[in-house]
């Protein structure tokens, strides 16, 4: 399997705008999994208020942000390392660990592989199959840990949407501890679940020093342009990361946005409810289309398998309608038959379904 190319994610709306001549605001982006409610009022106000502070260096300790993370997620500040997006921390982590071999449950988020290869690691895949609903077999995954330095789990997994139960994750983490491996559990989409507290691995941090939890704040709080994330790990790991990263890696506006976002309980509850309702309608609408098989979903995106056309062909057809979808051809263990769609608001989802229906008619986009 060839490693991922230099940039093959969804959400590259500016490149598409340059290619098509459309303004980014004219495009409906279903390729990026961002909260459809958009920026909260609290975040907008916090960023405006913080503008005058950008004449100063940002707080290198990110003290207020760490306090907000601590309150929101019930963890000690000593476990928290803040980052310029979760991706930055992923790369720093791989650079300081210098793994010789990593194990991925594929298909999954491509930056795990890219960060590992950038640090010189060999990458092995544990295949997740459509026949098994893309569910992880924790015992079989644990049996592959010999000689592995870092194992990555995404929960819920991007792009499949499958959830890993905490007990299943602990099976892997415990086996990895015996094998001398770190386990990075990416919980960037977990906040979209109403029962997220039942599935997070945060309660396992005290028992397993080899557990590292990665979390982006940009997806749930709709701030990908600001870049904000954090990592939870044993303080010894955090100290190593702090010495390796840029001391001012989280800018003033991102810190202010994070504090405001994490304290906004009303926005969080509204987001979970809105995404759950819209996702149910979207999955039903997709299932009614000819040649589309959506897989069960629990976060703010849906994986679907196509029959009668391919993802690259459909992507181009949808682009002519001003709609971006995620062609999953470049995911290891997926084929050109797969697409991923974000969950948006009902009127946007209706526009998506109408365009899909038109372009899938007679299987000839």
PLM features per residue range, with description:
Residues 25-26, 76-80, 101, 180, ...:
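Short acidic capping loops at alpha-helix termini that bridge into adjacent secondary structure
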Residues 39-40, 61, 210-288, 293-295:
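PLP-dependent aminotransferase class I/II
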Residues 1-56, 147:
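N-terminal "arm"/small-domain region of PLP-dependent enzymes with the aminotransferase-like
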Residues 96-115:
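Conserved PLP-anchoring active-site segment centered on the Schiff-base-forming lysine
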Residues 167, 320-321, 330-365:
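PLP-dependent enzyme catalytic core of the Aspartate aminotransferase-like
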Residues 55-101:
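Phosphate-binding glycine-rich loop
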Residues 276, 289-322, 343:
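Conserved PLP-binding catalytic core of the aspartate aminotransferase-like
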Residues 124, 130-193:
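Active-site phosphate-binding strand-loop segment of PLP-dependent enzymes
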């Amino acid at each position: 399997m060839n490693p991922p190319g230099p940039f093959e994610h969804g959400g590259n709306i500016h490149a598409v705008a340059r290619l098509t001549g459309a303004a980014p605001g004219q495009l409906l982006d279903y390729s990026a999994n961002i909260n459809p409610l958009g920026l909260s009022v609290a975040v907008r106000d916090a960023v405006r208020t913080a503008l005058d502070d950008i004449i100063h260096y940002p707080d290198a300790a990110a003290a207020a942000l760490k306090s907000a993370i601590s309150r929101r997620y019930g963890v000690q500040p000593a476990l928290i390392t803040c980052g310029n997006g979760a991706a930055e921390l992923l790369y720093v982590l791989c650079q300081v660990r210098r793994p010789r071999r990593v194990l991925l449950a594929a298909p999954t988020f491509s930056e795990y592989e890219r960060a590992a290869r950038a640090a010189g690691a060999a990458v092995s895949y544990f295949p997740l199959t459509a026949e098994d609903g893309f569910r992880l077999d924790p015992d079989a995954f644990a049996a592959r840990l010999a000689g592995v330095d870092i194992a990555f789990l995404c929960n819920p997994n991007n792009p499949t949407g499958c959830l890993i139960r905490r007990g299943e994750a602990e099976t892997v983490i415990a086996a990895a501890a015996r094998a001398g491996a770190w386990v990075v559990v990416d919980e960037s989409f977990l906040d979209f679940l109403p029962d997220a507290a039942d599935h997070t691995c945060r309660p396992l941090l005290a028992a397993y020093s080899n557990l590292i939890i990665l979390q982006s704040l940009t997806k749930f709080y709709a701030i990908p342009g600001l870049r904000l994330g954090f990592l939870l790990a044993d303080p010894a790991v955090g100290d190593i990361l702090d010495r390796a990263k840029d001391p001012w890696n989280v800018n003033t506006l991102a810190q202010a946005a994070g504090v405001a976002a994490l304290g906004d309980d009303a926005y969080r509850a509204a987001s979970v409810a809105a995404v759950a309702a819209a996702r149910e309608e979207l999955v039903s609408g997709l299932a009614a289309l000819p040649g589309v098989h959506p897989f069960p979903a629990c976060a703010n995106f849906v994986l679907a398998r196509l029959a009668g056309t391919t993802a690259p062909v459909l992507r181009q057809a949808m682009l002519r309608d001003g709609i971006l979808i995620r062609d999953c051809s470049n995911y290891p263990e997926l084929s050109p038959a797969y697409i991923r769609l974000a969950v948006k608001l009902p009127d946007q989802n209706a526009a998506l379904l109408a365009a899909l229906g038109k372009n899938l008619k007679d299987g000839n986009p």
